[in-house]
Regions:
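Catalytic cores of nucleotide-sugar-dependent glycosyltransferases that transfer UDP/GDP/TDP-activated
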Residues: 1-565
Length: 565
């Protein structure tokens, strides 16, 4: 990597090589949107000519021989070993190793345990199990990885941490480079703001390895000297706020989330080093159509919808955890689940789909209440909830309780087993995707739906207010409806309107148009949705924004290098 010389130190000239630190990476280990988002970052940067290394805890993936072969994993000749000193004064030994591989041109480094104690944490297959310890040991791993890349002339142009789990590791890596007088910029992305706090001991040289020493912090228009511990104590040990303060640039996934959530919590004065980098999707309508034709012999949305609703007896989706399975099983007869975990069919009608985690944030409890009211006006409406179980059994029980009185209209699929092609087919066939989130930094499910031409009905919160264009605000460019947050009535009205427009413009049935609050061609709305995704939410557009953010961070690092001089 070309380095620019400053008095007594070096800093990158531009961005040629990026380190992406993350706990999730699609194709390695991923639970939700973070893994897909970081993979889009990495592969998009690669398309722009940036060499990318993704660094993640192993989560035990190196034990899977098939996976190891598929990414050509091989052990690296580097070990991080030492002792952490606990608050109890005892020493806790760690021994960390590394596996190196490649996935679609992106270099992977998996951080693993080399003894049973270390492996019990870094290699735990549950991504977020023992989370504070995984995050701490990932930071300790930098003590060996940084000298290794220095010796092999592989110094990154930027270190990019994604969410708080990798923040201390990224800051520690930057500190280790600066010990060698190389000012590598640190970029921090907040995908979802978390209020995680620890005492200084957690981050310190005793535990996670961060040495307390002077550091330059950007204060509105100049860098000022502080120390890592002083910054930590200033923010009360809040890891997200600490990472933002330490960063050369930080990003969030939407302007609304940055303005309404992030800056009010970290400080408006930090806006000068902020960036907005949208997530992206690789969903395409062509892929949905090909699968629909191959699997169901239908590419027309209405025809596919009919076949999918009739095909439900062939869909077997067994929940992965006992609590979810038990909740559904006990009510199976009233919610259309058969004894073999297949589903009773549904009759044809306007279809609304929900996808995402079954958690309070995502608002499925609000949706099921709104849908009950929809049926008063559109009796043949259908709702399919395709949810990822979260362990919130009270919320799931509430869904089941309400769905039990709508046996002929609602199906709940609570399993991770539904393949991407089938998920895409359900969304493609839908009248609309409904996203009733109480808060949403970005809303990738909405973008995925629009990518296959499915309009979105959402609460007008945070990122959803940017991804979805309300038809009432712009009939020419609208992609769906944004309604008042947590309003069951407005959500119902939007769903009834979508059903009316879909029937009128896709089936020639205008019998419901008296209930619609706008009159627009639903086919045109579908086209608008696809155009919007192609212009704003594709991998290349995301990578260009991210690269601009990296270059802002490079300038900041150069300013710090000048301050050092």
């Amino acid at each position: 990597m070309p380095l620019q010389r400053f008095p007594g130190c070096l800093a990158p000239e531009d961005v040629e090589r990026a380190w992406l630190l993350t706990f999730e990476y699609a194709g390695v280990a991923s639970l939700g949107g973070l893994g897909n988002a970081v993979r889009r970052f990495a592969e998009g940067l690669l398309e722009l000519g940036v060499k990318v290394t993704v660094i993640t805890p192993s989560h035990g993936r190196h034990f899977d021989e098939g996976f190891a072969r598929s990414v050509n994993l091989r052990a690296m000749s580097v070990v991080a070993e030492g002792d952490r000193i606990g608050l109890d004064g005892n020493r806790y030994h760690y021994r960390i190793g590394f596996e190196r591989g490649e996935l679609n041109g992106v270099e992977l480094i998996l951080v693993k345990g080399l003894d049973s104690a270390t492996g019990s944490m870094l290699d735990d297959p549950s991504v977020y199990s023992k989370l504070p310890e995984k995050a701490s040991l990932l930071a300790r791993a930098m003590e060996a990885l940084v000298p290794y890349v220095l010796a092999n002339n592989e110094v990154p142009s930027v270190i990019h941490s994604n969410d708080w789990h990798t923040a201390i590791a990224g800051i520690r890596a930057r500190q280790l480079f600066e010990d060698r007088k190389i000012y590598v910029p640190f970029v921090y992305t907040i995908h979802l703001f978390n209020d995680v706090t620890f005492p200084w001991h957690y981050a310190s040289i005793d535990w996670s390895g961060l040495r307390d020493c002077p550091t330059y912090v950007w204060k509105v228009y100049r860098h000022e000297v502080s120390s890592h511990r002083e910054l930590w104590e200033t923010v009360g040990g809040h890891v997200e706020r600490f990472a933002v303060m330490e960063s050369d640039a930080f990003s969030s996934v939407s302007r609304a989330y940055l303005r309404n959530v992030v800056l009010p919590r970290v400080g408006e004065w930090l806006d000068g080093k902020s960036c907005v980098v949208y997530n992206s999707t690789d969903w395409r309508v062509e892929d949905a159509v090909r699968f629909a034709e191959r699997a169901f012999g239908a590419s027309d949305r209405s025809a596919l919808r009919r076949r999918l609703l009739e095909w439900l007896p062939h869909l077997r989706a067994v929940p992965e955890d006992y609590g979810t399975g038990n909740t559904l099983w006990n009510a199976r007869k009233s919610i259309g689940i058969r004894d073999d975990w297949t589903y009773e069919p549904l009759g044809y009608g306007p279809l609304f789909v929900f996808t995402g985690r079954l958690v309070f944030q995502k608002g499925p409890d609000l949706l099921i209440r709104a849908f009950r009211e929809v049926l008063q006006e559109v009796p043949d409406a259908r709702l399919i909830v395709i949810g990822i179980p979260s362990g919130d059994y009270a919320l799931l029980g509430d869904l089941v309780s309400h769905a039990s009185s709508m046996t002929n209209n609602v199906r709940i699929i609570a399993s991770r087993s539904l393949g991407q092609d089938l998920l895409k087919a359900f969304v493609y066939s839908a009248t609309a995707l409904v996203m009733p989130s109480r808060w949403e930094p970005f809303g990738l499910s909405a973008v995925e739906a629009m990518a296959v031409g499915t309009p979105v009905i959402a609460y007008g919160v945070d990122g959803l207010s940017e991804t979805v264009i309300d038809l009432r605000a712009s009939a020419e460019e609208g992609t769906g409806f944004l309604v008042a947050p947590e309003s069951v009535r407005e959500l119902k009205d939007a769903m009834v309107t979508a059903a009316a427009l879909s029937k009128a413009y896709e089936e020639g049935d205008r019998s419901l148009m008296g209930k619609a609050f706008v009159d627009v061609d639903w086919r045109r709305v579908r086209e608008n949705a696809m155009r919007r995704v192609d212009s704003e939410f594709r991998q290349r557009a995301t990578a260009v924004r991210l690269l601009d953010c990296y270059r802002k961070a490079v300038k900041m690092a150069q300013y710090r290098a000048l301050s050092f001089g």
